[in-house]
Swiss-Prot record:
N6-succinyllysine carried by residues: K251
Highest taxon above the source species: Eukaryota
Binding residue positions for substrate: 10-17, 23-24, 62, 89-92, 100, 116-117, 187-188
SUPFAM superfamilies referenced in this protein's UniProt entry, alphabetically: Phosphoglycerate mutase-like
Catalytic reaction list: (2R)-2-phosphoglycerate = (2R)-3-phosphoglycerate; (2R)-3-phospho-glyceroyl phosphate = (2R)-2,3-bisphosphoglycerate + H(+)
Residues carrying Phosphoserine: S14, S23, S31, S118
ATP-binding in keyword set: no
Phosphotyrosine: residues carrying this PTM: Y26
Name listed for the protein in its UniProt record: Phosphoglycerate mutase 1
Assembly notes: Homodimer.
């Protein structure tokens, strides 16, 4: 018997997803299609009768706007929202802004897959001469981060290492209080939570593709452990196509 329910949603397609570019900590907004994805995700939650007590998101507008769109659809815009850099997307370092297919053609699909999907291999760091270095590293939303906390690049392992303390210290206590929690975040910060919840191996998390804009539902026991695998709110065809699209992102164009 489930003691709690948790809903995760990956932000809708961003303008840089649309251009197939590595976004990372660059603050790309939703594309028009991404806004529609978020709207459909919200409508799926509304149709299923979901209500929430508290929401968590990153400090990046594609996740925040997805959350706003969902809350609008379910008519719960008044809910408290906690924003944290710890739920940000993985920092793609020197790859930030590069087209994924062009990068695959240059470095090989295998190398790009390692950078995108490996557990502990970071991409090349973002150097001070990178075109988006000041845009990210000097942004005042990160002014309170220590030098150790502000990354120049991250592996998935690094992303999980900064997301999990927030999960354990801030989100889990809310779940255990019986609060109905909604998390709107990013592919890699959410994969970190999923890996932790399901006890997935490093190899399994490498192959996990989370679709954009589709609510992911977990039923949890009293210890905040899943009693069954994640469920997607949406028709099977929509979910399958979305997951395939995510998997195809790092492949060179034929």
């Amino acid at each position: 018997m489930a003691a709690y329910k948790l809903v995760l949603i990956r932000h809708g397609e961003s303008a840089w997803n649309l251009e197939n570019r590595f976004s990372g900590w660059y603050d790309a907004d939703l594309s028009p299609a991404g806004h529609e994805e978020a709207k459909r995700g919200g409508q799926a939650l509304r149709d299923a009768g979901y209500e929430f007590d508290i929401c968590f998101t990153s400090v990046q507008k594609r996740a925040i706007r997805t959350l706003w769109t969902v809350l609008d659809a379910i008519d719960q815009m008044w809910l408290p929202v906690v924003r944290t850099w710890r739920l940000n997307e993985r920092h793609y370092g020197g790859l930030t802004g590069l087209n994924k297919a062009e990068t695959a053609a240059k470095h090989g699909e295998a190398q790009v897959k390692i950078w995108r999907r490996s557990y502990d291999v970071p991409p090349p760091p973002m150097e001070p001469d990178h075109p988006f270095y000041s845009n990210i590293s000097k942004d005042r939303r990160y002014a309170d981060l220590t030098e150790d906390q502000l990354p120049s690049c991250e592996s998935l392992k690094d992303t999980i290492a900064r997301a999990l303390p927030f999960w354990n210290e801030e989100i889990v206590p809310q779940i255990k209080e019986g609060k109905r929690v909604l998390i709107a975040a990013h592919g890699n910060s959410l994969r970190g939570i999923v890996k932790h919840l399901e006890g997935l191996s490093e190899e399994a998390i490498m192959e996990l593709n989370l679709p954009t804009g589709i609510p992911i539902v977990y039923e949890l026991d009293k210890n905040s452990k899943p009693i069954k695998p994640m469920q997607f709110l949406g028709d099977e065809e929509t979910v399958r196509k979305a997951m395939e699209a995510v998997a195809a992102q790092g492949k060179a164009k034929k």
